[in-house]
C-alpha cells in the first residue's frame, strides 16, 4: 500500500480527493497528510485521523515517508512547491500548468532530474482512451504525413467563475506573470493535447502567431487563436473562448496525406475505420491517479510526464509575446445578460467565426473581423536544442 499526501484540499483539490478516496477504498493507498492554507479544514481532517498542515514545508519536514504527493494549489505556486517536494525525494503529481515561463519550467525540470523522481502533470485529457488511440495512430503513421491539427474549445463561463479564486482571470498576480485564461487554464488541456499529437507525428514547434482578447472585465484573456508551425511542416490552429453561447466539447481535427481523424472529449474518435466511443469517467482525475499508482507499482508509462509539457509552456509563452497585449473587444460585439443572479457575457458570432476561420486555416485577424488585431510571428528555434 502506498502512502500519499495532498497539498491543496479546497477548490479543484476536491476532485483529487475523490480520486484518492477511490484508490483508498481499493486498498491501494493511504492518505497520510493533507495541507491547505485555510485552517478551517483542520477539524475535519483531524477527526479523520489524517495529519493536517497549513504550510507545505512543515508537512515535508514532519511526514517521514511518502510514495507520492499531489499538488493542487494556485498556479503561481505550482513550480515552487513541486521543486520542494522533489528535493525531499518525493514523486509529484502536479496540477496543470506545471509552469508559466520557460525558465521556470527549466528549473523544475532540473529539480526533477536532480531528485531522480518523477513529476507527472494533471492534464486530464491525456488520459482519455480515445485520445490515446489517436496518439497511437499518429505514431504508427496511419494517417500518413500530417498537414494540419485544428483544435476548438468553445466554453461558457459566468462572472461568478472569476470570483472563485483571487487569481482567476488575472494577467499578473502579486508580481507573478500568471497569464490566466484559455491558454493556461481551461483550454490548456486542448492545447497540450494538440502539441502531443504533433510530437507523435514528429513535429517540433518552431514558430507561433497569436491573438489574445477579452470580453469580461478581467486583466487576462478569455478568447484566443494561435497558429503554430512545426519543423516538419505541420500547422496547428487553436481557437478558444470562454464567451460562447453554450459550452461545446473540446475537439481536435487532423488532416493527413492518408486520411483524417476527429477526436472529441470525452471518449470520441472518428476515423476512416468508423467511430469509437468510450464511456466518460465521472471524475477524469481518477484515471490520472490510477496511472500514477500503476507507474509507481508496475512501471506503466505515465499519461503526462513533466517532460512532455515543454512544448506547451514554450508555445504559451510565445503566444503572449506574439500578441503583445490583450485586446478588449468592444461591447457592441458582446451580449450581456443576467442568469439566476449571475452575469454572463457572450461574444457575438464566435461559433460561426471559429468554424469559418478553421475552414480557411486562418486567424481571426485574417477573417475581416472588425475587432481582431494580428500578432507578431515568434521564432521558437532559440528555445529548442
PLM regions and their residue ranges:
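Hydrophobic residues in well-ordered beta-strands that form the structural core
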Residues: 94, 119-121, 263
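Beta-loop-alpha module in the N-terminal Rossmann-like domain of NAD(P)-dependent dehydrogenases
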Residues: 10, 16, 50-111
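Short, Asp-centered acidic motifs that coordinate Mg2+ and/or phosphate
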Residues: 33, 67-68, 148
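Contiguous beta-strand/loop segments that form the cofactor/metal-binding neighborhood of enzyme cores
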Residues: 179, 185-302, 316-320, 332-385
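Helix C-cap/helix->beta junction micro-motif
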Residues: 27, 88, 114-115
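Glycine- and charged-residue-rich phosphate/anionic-cofactor binding loop of Rossmann-like
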Residues: 29-32, 298-311
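Predominantly a Rossmann-like dinucleotide-binding segment in NAD(P)-dependent oxidoreductases
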Residues: 120, 125-209, 214-217
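N-terminal Rossmann-like dinucleotide-binding module
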Residues: 1-48, 382-384
Amino acid at each position: 500500500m502506498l502512502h500519499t499526501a495532498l497539498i491543496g484540499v479546497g477548490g479543484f483539490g476536491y476532485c483529487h480527493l475523490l480520486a484518492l478516496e477511490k484508490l483508498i477504498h481499493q486498498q491501494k493507498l493511504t492518505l497520510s497528510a493533507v495541507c491547505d492554507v485555510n485552517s478551517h479544514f483542520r477539524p475535519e481532517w483531524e477527526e479523520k485521523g489524517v495529519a493536517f498542515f497549513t504550510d507545505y514545508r512543515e508537512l515535508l519536514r514532519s511526514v517521514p515517508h511518502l510514495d507520492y504527493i499531489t499538488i493542487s494549489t494556485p498556479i503561481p505556486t505550482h513550480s515552487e512547491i513541486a521543486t520542494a517536494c522533489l528535493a525531499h525525494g518525493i514523486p509529484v503529481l502536479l496540477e496543470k500548468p506545471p509552469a508559466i515561463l520557460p525558465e521556470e519550467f527549466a528549473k523544475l525540470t532540473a529539480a526533477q532530474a536532480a531528485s531522480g523522481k518523477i513529476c507527472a502533470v494533471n492534464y486530464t485529457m491525456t488520459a482519455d482512451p480515445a485520445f490515446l488511440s489517436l496518439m497511437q495512430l499518429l505514431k504508427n503513421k496511419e494517417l500518413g504525413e500530417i498537414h494540419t491539427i485544428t483544435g476548438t474549445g468553445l466554453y461558457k463561463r459566468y462572472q461568478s467563475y472569476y470570483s472563485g479564486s483571487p487569481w482567476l482571470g488575472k494577467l499578473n498576480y502579486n508580481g507573478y506573470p500568471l497569464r490566466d485564461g484559455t491558454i493556461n487554464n481551461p483550454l490548456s488541456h486542448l492545447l497540450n493535447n494538440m502539441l502531443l499529437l504533433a510530437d507523435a507525428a514528429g513535429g517540433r514547434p518552431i514558430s507561433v502567431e497569436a491573438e489574445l482578447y477579452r470580453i469580461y472585465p478581467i486583466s487576462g484573456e478569455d478568447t484566443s487563436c494561435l497558429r503554430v508551425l512545426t519543423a516538419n511542416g505541420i500547422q496547428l490552429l487553436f481557437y478558444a473562448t470562454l464567451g460562447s453561447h453554450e459550452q461545446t466539447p473540446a475537439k481536435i481535427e487532423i488532416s493527413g496525406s492518408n486520411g483524417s481523424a476527429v477526436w472529441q472529449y470525452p471518449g470520441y474518435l472518428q476515423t476512416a475505420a468508423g467511430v469509437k466511443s468510450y464511456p466518460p469517467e465521472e471524475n477524469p482525475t481518477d484515471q490520472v491517479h490510477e496511472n500514477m499508482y500503476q507507474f509507481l507499482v508496475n512501471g506503466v508509462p505515465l499519461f503526462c510526464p513533466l517532460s512532455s509539457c515543454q512544448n506547451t509552456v514554450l508555445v504559451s509563452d510565445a503566444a503572449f509575446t506574439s500578441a503583445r497585449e490583450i485586446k478588449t473587444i468592444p461591447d457592441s460585439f458582446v451580449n450581456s445578460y443576467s442568469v439566476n443572479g449571475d452575469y454572463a457575457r457572450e461574444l457575438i458570432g464566435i461559433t460561426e467565426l471559429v468554424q469559418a476561420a478553421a475552414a480557411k486555416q486562418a486567424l481571426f485577424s485574417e477573417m475581416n473581423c472588425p475587432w481582431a488585431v494580428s500578432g507578431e510571428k515568434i521564432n521558437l528555434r532559440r528555445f529548442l536544442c
